[in-house]
Amino acid sequence: MTSSAPGSSGPSVDPAAVRALVDRARHEDVRLVRFHYVDPSGVTRGKAVHVAQLASRLRGGVGLTRAQNAINVFDDLVDIDGLEPVGEIRLLPDLSTWTRLPWLRATASVLCEQLGHDGADWGAVRGRSSPGRSRRWPRPASR
């Protein structure tokens, strides 16, 4: 994913990369693509997209209600301000993470980050595009 141009709405994706991935999906006989993300509880969750809609979903992402991030590890919806079922964020895929799933017929997956419609962090979950965010895990404090 590349950054969006000033004044545009949302992040932009290289059209050639999208075409290449759609062609790869057809070549690999993929019919469903799982858009995976990790919620604040550390649980991997996702939404599936049919290959017929893959190009548009790779470009614009997949909609996700903010309330999905208020579901705990027991699948209970926790009442948290700002994580109501009204208001949507986007699951924006990292095209380099495309993986054909060998244990599921005709299925692939792609890892996503959660962003607002404008491509910026939406507040509850910081994406890798966050300014000043370290890409390394913090070292544990020495005892």
Each predicted region: which residue ranges?
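ATP/Mg2+-dependent ligation/transfer catalytic cores
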Residues: 1-143
